[in-house]
């Protein structure tokens, strides 16, 4: 990511609300246990999209490969401990739906759209992201969700092109100033993509600022936050299932944002246990 300009840096450093920085620091301080030692991540929220990068000591924690075994080194610090990951289901469509006041039915978002498209789950997922991050085709603009998405994208673009070089857009939750001069080579969908990532980040910070104080009483630690997933080092013997249940309830925000749950002795070999929480 390209760093944002000094204007944004100054704004964040002088603004009374230091929630973003302080929340990320709370995650960083817990560290991640490897087979050799405890290592620490370092978040940088000053990126072109506002979505934090996370690298330290030559390791990119925001892009750990799921397939090459590099995650296997991460284990629990506790005797008989486990790593547990909560991963939001269809997070971006749900965030946009919430922003545009579109209520998804209970269950899978991609199954919901599969019925609309007349295709299977995997193809539905691919089409949804194609429409959201590409262009909503004319034939889909009569659908309540995609019609709202198209209008939202074009309204945002219309506002953006009217800005002069010193003007800015404000983020939805924390009113962060995103200066036009830092958003280069924009088009309507690229701008929308940037703003979705910022919306994701601020929504996560908002929920983490609620979650972290409530789980301080436990031995278990939250050790990594990556976009739509949250990794915890679970002290199973001390905290029992109470810890995981409380985390899940808070993250899901009264069921509005369902999560999938995986567990493993290391971060590479993780088993889906979502159904055990139903």
Short names for language-model regions:
Residues 238-241:
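Short, charged/polar, Gly/Pro-enriched secondary-structure boundary elements
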Residues 1-119, 176-215, 220-230, 243-250:
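Acidic, glycine-rich two-metal-ion catalytic cores of nucleic acid-processing enzymes
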Residues 231-236:
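Short beta-strand-to-loop capping motifs
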